């Protein structure tokens, strides 16, 4: 089983706030999305869809590795850019055949920080 499927199959018992329409959750790792106030260990609620709107934050599988990134599309150039919300991370740029290496799982609809 791939790392990605392990991430998504583990059901997290999390109280979603009223009105959150989410199909699954994942736990954020690292500091790549802190500009969107998503911190290491936060629970991210994902609505399953294979496309998101330009500029939305999505759960993306890149070569079997699950990650959260802001998605920018340039359809006229057949180009997709995945951006971290932290300037120390480079943009990930995909075009042409490279697009086959990534798969959008869904849109991030809500976040919940662990308050211990």
Task: Give the positions of each predicted feature.
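Short, small-residue-biased leader/transition segments that mark boundaries at the very start
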Residues: 1-8
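Acidic/glycine-rich C-terminal interaction modules and beta/coil loop segments
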Residues: 9-116
